[in-house]
Curated annotation (Swiss-Prot):
Residues 1-40 form the Globin domain. It comes from Saara hardwickii. This is Hemoglobin subunit alpha-2. It holds the Pfam family Globin. Keywords: Heme, Iron, Metal-binding, Oxygen transport, Transport.
Length: 40
């Protein structure tokens, strides 16, 4: 897990925004698409 922590964190945020779109209300400036630089 250690060496891939950044990858897993970005993926977790992406999944959170996909499953709970209302969460994006608090982060309107984020590009929540998969692989975006803001979620890495």
């Amino acid at each position: 897990v250690g060496p891939h922590l950044d990858d897993y964190g970005g993926e977790a945020l992406h999944r959170n925004f996909e499953v709970y779109p209302q969460t994006k209300t608090y982060f309107p400036h984020f590009d929540a698409s998969a692989g975006s630089n803001q979620l890495k």
